[in-house]
């Protein structure tokens, strides 16, 4: 019988991970499609742009933090007050080394559609098509453009998109989700109590990352996937 040391097993703790099932043709088909997109050379007329969105809690202080002193960090009371929720839209052009973050009060079809319109008309006005990588959230489709804009405008915007969806359980394939994690860790780890303050702090982070031209060097290829993720492929 195997014996475990005290505290070695912690059944009250869970770590969640999205695990695709074995021999999943749908997963590997969508995965290889994304990996093919990431393998394309940089083309200013057909930029590859990844997008993701998330919600973040606005948190206020019950008691003012005590400032840092020599030998002592800032002291923050463990009590807090919830101030609502803000939504984050993240757009990343990995090879171009630029991103755009927008903070909104909601994450509806309308909000997504306006984010896409701004992307196409303001940031990529000279591109023939934007190659857009994202997950298949129910708002992430051209129907949202028709919900937000007249048919002629919606069609025009839709025709400037080449959409590629990451597979279910494949969020790690979306570079924007990786960048969103960086944003949360570097900029949103502390308590922020209002959307205006969040917008200001995120804008400063966004500008700094773009000024540094921080690029993403994606190296995982289809060849790698067929070896390292062999169990996900149907067997013959």
Can you name each region flagged by the protein language model?
Residues 1-82:
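Charge-mixed, compositionally biased segments that are often intrinsically disordered regulatory tracts
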Residues 22, 62, 197-236:
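C-terminal domain-tail junction helix/linker
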Residues 50-52, 91, 97, 116, ...:
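Mobile genetic element proteins and their domesticated derivatives, centered on retroelements
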Residues 69-128:
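Electropositive, glycine- and tryptophan-enriched low-complexity nucleic-acid-binding patches
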Residues 74-80, 154-175, 191-194:
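RNase H-like polynucleotidyl transferase catalytic core
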Residues 86, 135-136, 163-184, 196:
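RNase H-like two-metal-ion nuclease catalytic core shared by retroviral integrases
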Residues 99, 176-194, 208-212:
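Active-site proximal helix-loop segment of RNase H-like, two-metal nucleases, encompassing DDE(D)
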Residues 127-141:
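Acidic/histidine-rich, metal-coordinating catalytic segments
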């Amino acid at each position: 019988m195997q014996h475990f040391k005290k505290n070695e097993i912690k059944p009250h703790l869970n770590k969640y991970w999205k695990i695709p099932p074995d021999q999943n043709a749908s997963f590997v088909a969508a995965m290889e499609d994304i990996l093919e997109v990431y393998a394309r050379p940089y083309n200013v007329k057909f930029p590859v742009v990844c997008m993701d969105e998330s919600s973040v809690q606005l948190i206020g202080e019950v008691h003012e933090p005590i400032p840092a002193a020599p030998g002592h960090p800032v002291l923050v009371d463990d009590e807090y007050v919830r101030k609502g929720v803000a939504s984050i839209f993240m757009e990343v052009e990995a090879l171009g080394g630029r991103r755009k973050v927008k903070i909104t009060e909601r994450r509806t079809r309308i909000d997504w559609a306006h984010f896409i319109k701004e992307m196409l008309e303001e940031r990529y006005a000279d591109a023939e098509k934007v190659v857009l990588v994202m997950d298949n959230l129910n708002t992430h489709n051209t129907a949202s453009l028709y919900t937000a804009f007249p048919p002629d405008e919606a069609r025009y915007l839709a025709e400037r998109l080449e959409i590629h969806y990451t597979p279910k359980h494949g969020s790690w394939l979306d570079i924007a989700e990786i960048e969103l994690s960086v944003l949360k860790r570097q900029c949103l780890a502390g308590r922020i109590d209002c959307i205006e303050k969040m917008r200001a702090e995120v804008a400063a982070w966004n500008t700094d990352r773009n000024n540094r031209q921080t690029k993403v060097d994606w190296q995982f290829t289809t060849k790698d996937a067929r070896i390292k993720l062999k169990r996900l492929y149907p067997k013959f």
